[in-house]
């Protein structure tokens, strides 16, 4: 899946004109898997950017660029909500909702080979998908965040939700 994410990430970058980042966490960096190679794409033609300052993020450029990115945030959230890498999987037990990020999702599913009894939101693309997050939060009593490395998503959720729902994770 990580291979496909990079492949599709480059397409997304070309479409939006924005760079993409592949967040390599420890567990992913130390794992191996067979991949099915995709068809190689033809080389892009080389051309100069209309605004090369978008790639030179000195403080003066970064402040202006930040405004542009904020204006496009809804577009990025919509792409995240429609991404095949973010998906909501319903479960019968609504006492707990699980947000599983990246390889944390694989570890969760290894422990539930017959399917997880709790609703799970698999996160593989950012920004966080609002629609799926609200679906999980509105149907569950509390949220558990599974992520590798720093508690990035957990911090985001605690600030983003702000509605009194309990969020558990590394910060507990």
Language model feature labels by segment:
Residues 2-172:
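Flexible, low-complexity linker and terminal segments
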């Amino acid at each position: 899946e990580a291979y496909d994410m990079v492949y599709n990430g480059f397409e997304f970058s070309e479409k939006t004109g924005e760079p993409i980042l592949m967040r390599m966490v420890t567990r992913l960096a130390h794992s191996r898997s067979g991949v099915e190679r995709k068809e190689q794409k033809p080389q892009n033609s080389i051309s100069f950017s209309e605004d090369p300052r978008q790639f030179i993020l000195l403080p003066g450029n970064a402040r202006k660029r930040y405004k542009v990115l904020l204006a496009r945030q809804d577009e990025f959230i919509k792409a995240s909500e429609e991404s095949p890498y973010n998906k909501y999987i319903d479960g019968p037990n609504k006492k707990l909702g699980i947000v599983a990020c990246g390889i944390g999702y694989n570890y969760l599913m290894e422990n539930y080979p017959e399917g997880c009894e709790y609703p799970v939101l698999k996160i593989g693309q950012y920004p966080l998908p609002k629609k799926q997050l609200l679906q999980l939060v509105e149907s569950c009593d509390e949220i558990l965040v599974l992520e590798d490395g720093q508690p990035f998503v957990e911090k985001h959720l605690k600030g983003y939700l702000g509605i009194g729902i309990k969020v558990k994770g590394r910060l507990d």
